[in-house]
């Protein structure tokens, strides 16, 4: 793939938590090194101030800009932050038709995102930028089998508990 298509490396500021900071760097191209230790721009400056971003650049090129996230709109203040980052629309789990479609851990399944992305694309005549954030993959993953007839089974981990966690993840 690297020989045939654009490719590169992508480094994120956090793993396992702090999704909003990874989003911030991705959407703005700005490093968190310019902020205080432990600061979340979503929880501070972006609640009240706009910031140059990919959505603003694309809006200037005639795109409609949409954000979609299958979690609560107020988590990390996204309800007020996304307009300040240039998104025309923001659809959160509260507005998703299949909100009750949850995985065994209570997260809204990613399968609802496809319909929401299509709704965004169908809502305008212009080109669209749809920024979509998944929540389903959040852990802590179950340490006992909870899936009936999993499509993929996992073995080879040091413990059965880890096998179950990996099996649920994949």
Question: PLM features: residue spans?
Answer:
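Solvent-exposed soluble domains appended to multi-pass membrane proteins
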Residues: 1-170
